[in-house]
């Protein structure tokens, strides 16, 4: 049974929060592709098979096709594409793009781009009746001691990156959940355990190798194509296909961290302490945490918990003193490697139905506590109406201080705009369930929770326009919260590097700059 290993453990909090740290419906079942009307795009796959990547094109019935489809994080996001392409080089990606954007194919060959397949939004990393460009074989991790940088492929997974770098005794800013892919994480921003010290993960990128919509291979750095370089840091899939990230390396140390669980009666204390921690994060930027509430059917236990991280091997650092004073139920905190942390009780959520939805608000304990109360109402409603099967709900609140933005500005900054409008708290609300018939229960209720919490924050003048792109659901609009100047920079870069709008229209999935009205730009 899915989740059984994690939930039978006394340290269930580990598996729960790991899902909350990923840096995100409905799905057509993975059966006969004829159901999806794939005949309309058959010529797209034929043209690809006749190109230089012909031996890397796979369709329904091929083992590679099913292997790729079964590797998506959520059953809801694996769709019946007409074929998938598994490029092994930037040149292969160029061939795919030049083939699919030919004038006689462009209007009938929609395609999706997949790095790790960890998006929870249907159609963002796969496509029904189209072509999926699967970057999973571009998964290299190469350390360059002469430049103190690491080359990363977009199809890598962060746990593999960390493992491959261990012999070199270096580290990079990366994901906190082992199965998250490199590509989407970095182009969406990337919250890491080092963010209070180094900014978002994208701020540690020193160059991008990019294939443009017309197949051109270019490099973007602070000196070469600087507008593209800047806007790729938060621009998601609006600009091109990144085939290599060159990122800064720094000395690897063990870290202190783990998961501590509490009775939900501690909710007011946890909310106040999270507000205080966020307000004082500059006093010790080596410390970071997430506070969350969770319920699962296998234990039938409702609990609160913290995931705490300290980026030096210091036992019980003073930055968390307020938390030590709160009575806990269990704890796994100890000094360990980052691989140990990101794989602790690695969950097995593949083929569960999954949703992510997010909200940000100003750092205020009242809003945090109200969010925890709304989560409890959500749990009660699900219990009363669910058809059956196992399910899990998580409401995770984490600091998003201005420090995440100002620290990154030392390396050129990004277009996300965290340095604006004060310290924030980001909520990632997640639900995992088994049965298709419960889609119409879990999803609308989650959206309602977000709307209700947003209204409450607004009533206290604690609301925020910001939404973290890597946590957002498909109906949300994270790019519109970047701020007017940043939005305009991204719009200009998209028009310059993709003048035909391939990544706006021919790639239907993803958050599009073209869908952000000019009127929504805010300084």
Curated annotation (Swiss-Prot):
Annotated pathway: Secondary metabolite biosynthesis; terpenoid biosynthesis
Source organism of this protein record: Aspergillus calidoustus
InterPro entries to which the protein is assigned, alphabetical: FAD-bd_PCMH (IPR016166), FAD-bd_PCMH-like_sf (IPR036318), FAD-bd_PCMH_sub2 (IPR016169), FAD-linked_Oxidoreductase (IPR050416), Oxid_FAD_bind_N (IPR006094)
Gene it is expressed from: drtC
Co-factor requirement: FAD
Family from the record: Belongs to the oxygen-dependent FAD-linked oxidoreductase family.
The protein, known as: FAD-dependent monooxygenase drtC
UniProt keyword list: FAD, Flavoprotein, Oxidoreductase
Keyword Oxidoreductase: yes
């Amino acid at each position: 049974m899915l989740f059984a290993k994690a939930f039978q453990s006394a340290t269930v909090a580990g598996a729960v929060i790991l899902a909350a740290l990923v840096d995100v419906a409905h799905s057509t079942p993975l059966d006969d592709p004829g159901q999806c009307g794939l005949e309309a795009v058959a010529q797209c796959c034929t043209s690809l098979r006749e190109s230089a990547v012909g031996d890397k094109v796979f369709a329904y019935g091929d083992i590679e096709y099913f292997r790729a489809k079964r590797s998506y994080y959520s059953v809801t996001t694996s769709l019946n594409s007409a074929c998938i392409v598994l490029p092994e080089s930037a040149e292969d990606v160029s061939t795919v793009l030049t083939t699919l954007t030919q004038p006689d194919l462009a209007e009938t060959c929609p395609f999706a781009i997949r790095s790790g397949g960890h998006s929870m939004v249907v159609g963002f990393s796969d496509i029904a009746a189209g072509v999926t460009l699967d970057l999973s074989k571009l998964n290299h991790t190469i350390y360059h001691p002469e430049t103190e940088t690491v080359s990363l492929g977009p199809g890598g997974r962060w746990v593999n990156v960390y493992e491959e770098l261990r012999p070199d005794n270096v580290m990079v800013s990366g994901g906190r959940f082992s199965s998250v892919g490199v590509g989407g994480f970095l182009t969406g921003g990337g919250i890491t355990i080092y963010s209070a010290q180094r900014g978002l993960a994208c701020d540690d990128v020193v160059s991008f190798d990019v294939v443009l919509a017309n197949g051109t291979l270019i490099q973007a750095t602070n000196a070469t194509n600087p507008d593209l370089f800047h806007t790729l840091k938060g621009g998601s899939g609006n600009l091109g296909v990144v085939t290599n990230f060159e990122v800064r390396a720094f000395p690897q140390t063990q870290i202190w961290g783990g998961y501590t669980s509490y009775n939900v009666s501690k909710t007011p204390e946890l909310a106040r302490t999270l507000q205080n921690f966020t307000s004082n994060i500059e006093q010790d930027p080596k410390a970071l945490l997430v506070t969350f509430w969770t319920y699962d059917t296998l234990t039938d236990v409702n609990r609160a918990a913290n995931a705490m991280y300290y980026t030096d091997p210091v036992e019980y650092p003073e930055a968390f003193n307020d938390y030590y004073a709160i009575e806990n139920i269990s704890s796994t905190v100890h000094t360990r490697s980052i691989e140990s942390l990101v794989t602790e009780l690695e969950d097995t959520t593949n083929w569960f139905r999954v949703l992510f939805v997010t909200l940000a608000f100003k750092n205020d304990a009242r809003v945090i506590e109200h969010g925890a109360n709304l989560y409890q109402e959500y749990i009660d409603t699900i219990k009363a109406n669910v058809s059956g099967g196992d399910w899990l709900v998580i409401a995770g609140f984490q600091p998003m201080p201005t420090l995440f933005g100002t620290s990154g500005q030392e390396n050129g900054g990004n277009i996300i705009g965290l340095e604006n409008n004060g310290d924030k708290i980001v909520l990632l609300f997640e639900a995992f369930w088994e049965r298709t018939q419960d889609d119409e229960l879990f999803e609308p209720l989650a959206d309602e929770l977000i709307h209700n919490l947003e209204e409450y924050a607004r009533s206290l003048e604690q609301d925020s326009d910001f939404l973290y792109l890597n946590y957002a659901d498909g109906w949300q609009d994270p790019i519109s919260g970047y701020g007017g100047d940043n939005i305009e920079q991204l719009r200009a870069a998209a028009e310059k590097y993709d003048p035909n709008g391939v990544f706006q229209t021919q790639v239907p999935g993803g958050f599009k700059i073209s869908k952000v009205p000019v009127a929504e730009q805010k300084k």
